[in-house]
Amino acid sequence: AIAVELARDVFEAIQTLSRGSVFQDMPLVSNKELMDLR
């Protein structure tokens, strides 16, 4: 559970920092990776 929460925090931080950048094309992949952690 802790790992999932950590991943969520990191994911949110990356999304916030990289808006308008290359990561804009990768949200679906990142979401899939988060789902796999559960």
UniProtKB/Swiss-Prot annotation:
Superkingdom of the organism of origin: Bacteria
pH dependence remark: Optimum pH is between 2 to 4. Active from pH 2 to 6.
UniProt KW keywords: Antibiotic, Antimicrobial, Bacteriocin
Regulation of its function: The antimicrobial activity of BAC79 was completely lost after treatment with enzymes trypsin, pepsin, proteinase-K, and carboxypeptidase, while there was no loss of activity with either amylase or lipase.
Name the UniProt record assigns to this protein: Bacteriocin BAC79
Protein purpose: Has antibacterial activity against a wide spectrum of Gram-positive and Gram-negative bacteria, including L.monocytogenes which is inhibited through disruption of the cell membrane.
Temperature dependency: Thermostable. Retains activity up to 100 degrees Celsius, and when exposed to 121 degrees Celsius. Also retains activity after storage at 4 degrees Celsius for 4 months.
GO BP term, pick one: killing of cells of another organism
